[in-house]
C-alpha cells in the first residue's frame, strides 16, 4: 500500500509541475498576469540602470513606491544581460518560484517530513493558483517568501539560533519586501513566551547586522533614499483605503474561491494541532505569516500575493504530518482529486488568457511608441515595452504621496493641468470616479485630466486620452 500511496503522490506532483510549466510556457511571450504593480518594479529597475532612485529622480519624475531594491535590481541585471523587459520580469518570477519550491522542500525535511511528505508539500504549493499567478507576475513576493521559508528551515535546524543562517535569510527576505517580517516576529514571539530569551536576542542582533550590511552593499544604488521612500510610504502614506475586517474576509474569500487553497488550509491546521508541532518554530512562523498577511490585506489595494509565505509554510506543515495524520487516507483522496482538477482549471484558463487579442498589448505599445510627445501611462510597462521611459513608477502611491504633500507627486498633477502630456494611457475610463479617487492618481491628477483631455480611442483594453482642442471654461 505504501508503494501505491507514494506513487500516487509522485504522480500528482508531476502533474502539478507539468501544469505549471505549461502555463509559464504559454504565457511567456504575453503580458498575462502583469499589471501596473509589475510596471512599478520595471520602472524601478529602469531607473537603477540610469543611476536614479527615489530622491534622485531624472527622466523619471516620480520614483516613489513600496518596493525595496533587491528584486528590481535583479530584474535590472537580467535586462542588462540582454533580455526584454517582458522576459526579464518573467525570468525573475520563474527563478524566484524555483527558489520558493526548493526552500519549501528544504524546510519540510528540516521539520522531519518523509520524502513522500516533501513531495506533498511541493505538490500543494505548485498546484495552487496563487503560486502560479505569482510565478507570472514579475514581482518580489516569491523571492521574499523563499527567503523567509529558508529562514524557517534554518531555524528548525538550529533551535537555539546559535548560527547566522536563520538571521541572514530572514534579513534577506525583509530587504526584498518591507512587509516580509514573518521570521523576526515569530522568533520574538517564541522568545517572549520562553524562559530563555537569549536565542531571540542573538537573532535580533544578527538580523540587524545583516540588514545593515545589505543596505550598505547597495549604497551606490541610492539604497538609503530608496528604503526611506518605501518605509515612509508604507507607514505614513499608504496607498488606497483600508478596512480592518478586509484582511480576514479576503483570506476566507480566497479559501472559498480555490479548492486547493482550502485543502492546504485544512491539512495545515490539522498538522499544527498535533502535539509534535505545538512547540515547533513552524507553528509560530505559520501563525505569524497568516497574521501579517491579514494585516496587509486590510488595505484595499493588497492582493493574494501577500499570502505566498503563508501558503508555503502551510504546505510544509501538511507535508510534515503526511505520514502521521489520522486522516491520511482522506487526505490522499483529497489530494488526488483536488490538485489535478486545480491544474486542469488553471491550464485552460491561462491558455484562454494568453490567446486573448490584447494579451500581447501590441496596439497600445504601438500607440505609445508612435507618439512623439511626452506620454503618461497608468501601467508603466506600456511605456517601457515601447522603448520609452516612464515619468512615474506607481499611480497608487502617486495618489497617496500627493495627498501627503510630496512635491514630486504633485508635479505630475501640475503637468497634467498644464496639458503637458501628448498622450495619457489609462486602464479604464477616466469617468470611473471611485477607482481614480480611492486607488490610482487621485483627484489632483484626474480632475485636470477630465477637464483638459478627451478620450481618443482604445487599444488592447486601455483607454487613450489626448489634450482637448479647446479647454472648456472653468465654471
Would you name each region that the model predicts?
Residues 101-105, 257-291:
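Hydrophobic, aromatic-rich transmembrane alpha-helices
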Residues 149-154, 162-178, 184-191, 209, ...:
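Membrane-interface alpha helices of multi-pass inner-membrane proteins
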